[in-house]
């Protein structure tokens, strides 16, 4: 049989109040009533709307329906979960009013007549997982850190249909070496289970904040290094920043813009730590007096060099 998304059919959210559900039902019932509607498949849609309202208007049926979970999609193949059973008593649905209802409805709420009531007794459902995004600095990703998260959990009062939020705080540890998009699983920190079933898990997705000096690819860190023409030509020892502190780097003679130097193990830590790559970019100083212009002129005369030679064949 196919799962019926009653909230989607009525066009309301899962935390809709009883009044919102009733208002939407009345609007859609008028729209699709076969006696007045010119909509295609109006009769079928009217039955779907009627069925959805029959469940969501009733406190116990809605409570039981919600226990199935929100991970299902309209039309998806469905089988009632183990432990789903009926109990006598309470408000049922008279057979004449169930005519045309789906197999999905009948499998969950039909079959016991006017004196039937469906419950969640002995029905267990693992709590839903929650997902959150945490932005950390590159320094935090390198060193590790702790965070105090504030989480909002929806609480539904099935007697009134009102939805409130419960706030809780959770201190978490960000391990050293986390990377962009990595997920941290916190077991049992999701929404509560039903009928004694375990809680869901909380998944934290790591987002690395942009850095003023470094860019990151996986565990590797990249730094653009400005150098002077004479440092590039003659070679030099320069001090550069890394996430673990400053280190000395030797520029080989004849370094070129775009050349990449590797500092092994200076990236983000882990079982196999990343590397830091230094990208050389040569900056040409502008001559500001006649003496400096003369130096450039001497270079042009004493170092004949045509970087466009290959372009001209």
Curated annotation (Swiss-Prot):
Residues 5-69 form the J domain. GO terms for molecular function: bent DNA binding; unfolded protein binding. Residues 71-93 are annotated as: Disordered. HAMAP family: CbpA (MF_01154). It comes from the Bacteria. The keyword Chaperone applies. Pfam families: DnaJ, DnaJ_C. This is Curved DNA-binding protein. Keywords: Chaperone, Cytoplasm, DNA-binding. It is found in: Cytoplasm, Nucleoid. DNA-binding protein that preferentially recognizes a curved DNA sequence. It is probably a functional analog of DnaJ; displays overlapping activities with DnaJ, but functions under different conditions, probably acting as a molecular chaperone in an adaptive response to environmental stresses other than heat shock. Lacks autonomous chaperone activity; binds native substrates and targets them for recognition by DnaK. Its activity is inhibited by the binding of CbpM. GO terms for cellular component: cytoplasm; nucleoid. GO terms for biological process: chaperone cofactor-dependent protein refolding; protein refolding.
